[in-house]
């Protein structure tokens, strides 16, 4: 016996309490009093943690209640039919007195509870069973009745302690916590559902916007296809359309009206009115009129040559006009060195020779249709208007004509004779253009008297200006 066991036994004697018999089960047989064999942990499922010998020399064991396996047969409180279990004591205290002392040690501090709490929790005391009671607070009696009574008392004490704990957690205002928790969970679920619905609506909105943009793009493409089918000009290449904006804006009515006014004096005397009229007519043209005009042109004779097949010839004419004006401006003193009679006689003969040349080059020009001739004449009248606008001498021409009428009537009569010749020449030139002969247009002549007089006959304003300046120099 060591000092620790002696100290424990001395304290037990002083307190009149025997603690060495707790959780110890021995047989009452005198043969096995000192030599009882303890079962191993593998047989009953419990581990032995500590062994000590009491004052009487008997071996006792403290067992830790951590079962390795759950089995009803190995339960420590189960009664054995072949053995009678009693509490071993080493003192002279009787068994009832020891039981009363042990009950006083295991009774808990009980808080007074209401009858309602005891009625609401009847299953707590019954559900505890033998597993809810600590093994240290139970005592194995010598009979089955003593063990049952001890268990009943321990159950009542534990149920009272549990009831006291639950009574303290119940709120005093009468509101059920479970109902509050249930409502809280319901609200959280509703919020989650609302959030999910919002996200779904956002995704659906984005999808609808994408569908809208796609359908709008398809509608725009269909509109372009329909416009291309209705207006064939949109299908023509840009190269062919770049040379025809000026003539496309002139309707057929304006061309027929300009056909009768193709003479040079009318084009010189009314350049401003013609410019305004052509501008207004070009602004009033609508796409429907252009489409109707193209349909009429397509329905006409297929053998007739189109005017738009010669855009380079038209630009060649403009190039020659501009080149001639530049040469005339640079060589102004040379052209004014001679007398007016010589200057006026030369253009007459040159104009006659040029008219004969155009007649010889275009023998079958008069056999063309009148509509084509009117179109060509209107085109040449438009060219003369553009040239007059480029020169910018309309106002000076009006003043020069008035001064010439007052100073030199003889020169005026000669000029009228020259205008008649130039009118005949322009008519022949229009017929030559209708015939499609461009031999005279492809030849470029620089600083020749024939070219100079031919262009002077085509524009009366240039002749008036040259004559007026010649007389000023002679004075």
Swiss-Prot record:
Phosphothreonine: modified positions: 236
Pfam families per UniProt: TDA11 (PF17084)
Phosphoserine carried by residues: 244, 286
Annotated signal peptide: none
Ranges of compositional bias, category Basic and acidic residues: 290-301, 403-421
Keyword set, alphabetical order: Coiled coil, Cytoplasm, Phosphoprotein
Compositional bias of kind Polar residues: 257-287, 332-359, 368-377
Sequence segments annotated as region (Disordered): 32-62, 252-306, 332-377, 400-475
Cross-referenced InterPro entries: Tda11 (IPR031388)
Localization per record: Cytoplasm
GO CC list: cytoplasm
Coiled-coil ranges from the UniProt annotation: 179-231
Assigned protein family: Belongs to the TDA11 family.
Name this protein carries in UniProt: Topoisomerase I damage affected protein 11
Species assigned in the record: Saccharomyces cerevisiae (strain Lalvin QA23) (Baker's yeast)
């Amino acid at each position: 016996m060591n000092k620790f066991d002696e100290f424990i036994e001395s304290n037990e004697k002083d307190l009149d309490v025997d603690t060495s018999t707790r959780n110890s089960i021995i047989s009452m047989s005198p043969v096995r009093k000192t030599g009882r064999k303890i079962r191993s942990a593998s047989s009953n499922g419990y581990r032995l943690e500590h062994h000590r010998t009491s004052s009487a020399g008997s071996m006792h064991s403290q067992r830790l209640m951590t079962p390795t396996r759950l089995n009803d047969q190995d339960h420590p409180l189960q009664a054995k039919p072949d053995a009678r279990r009693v509490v071993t004591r080493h003192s002279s205290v009787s068994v009832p007195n020891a039981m009363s002392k042990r009950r006083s040690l295991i009774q808990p501090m009980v808080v007074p509870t209401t009858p309602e709490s005891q009625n609401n929790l009847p299953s707590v005391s019954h559900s505890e069973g033998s597993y809810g009671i600590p093994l240290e607070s139970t005592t194995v009696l010598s009979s089955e009745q003593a063990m049952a009574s001890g268990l009943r008392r321990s159950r009542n004490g534990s149920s009272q302690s549990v009831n006291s704990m639950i009574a303290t957690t119940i709120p005093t205002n009468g509101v059920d916590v479970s109902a509050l928790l249930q409502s809280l969970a319901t609200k959280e679920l509703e919020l989650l559902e609302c959030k999910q619905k919002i996200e779904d609506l956002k995704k659906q909105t984005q999808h609808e916007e994408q569908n809208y943009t796609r359908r709008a793009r398809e509608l725009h493409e269909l509109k372009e296809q329909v416009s291309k089918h209705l207006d064939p000009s949109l299908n023509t290449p840009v190269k062919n359309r770049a040379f025809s904006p000026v003539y496309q804006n002139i309707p057929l009515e304006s061309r027929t009206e300009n056909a009768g006014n193709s003479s040079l004096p009318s084009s010189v005397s009314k350049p401003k009115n013609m410019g305004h009229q052509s501008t207004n007519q070009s602004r009033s043209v609508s796409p429907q009129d252009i489409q109707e005009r193209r349909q009429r042109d397509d329905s006409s004779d297929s053998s007739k040559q189109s005017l738009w097949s010669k855009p380079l010839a038209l630009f060649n004419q403009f190039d020659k006009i501009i080149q001639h004006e530049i040469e005339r401006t640079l060589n102004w003193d040379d052209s004014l060195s001679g007398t007016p009679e010589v200057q006026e006689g030369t253009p007459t003969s040159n104009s006659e020779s040029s008219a004969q040349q155009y007649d010889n080059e275009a023998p079958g020009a008069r056999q063309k249709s009148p509509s084509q001739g009117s179109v060509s004449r209107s085109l040449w009248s438009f060219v003369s208007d553009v040239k007059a606008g480029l020169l910018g001498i309309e106002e000076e021409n009006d003043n020069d004509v008035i001064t010439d009428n007052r100073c030199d009537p003889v020169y005026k009569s000669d000029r009228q004779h020259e205008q008649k010749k130039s009118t005949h020449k322009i008519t022949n030139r229009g017929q030559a253009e209708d015939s499609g002969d461009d031999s005279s247009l492809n030849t470029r002549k620089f600083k020749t008297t024939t070219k100079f007089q031919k262009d002077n006959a085509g524009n009366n304003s240039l002749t008036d200006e040259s004559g007026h300046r010649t007389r000023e120099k002679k004075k």
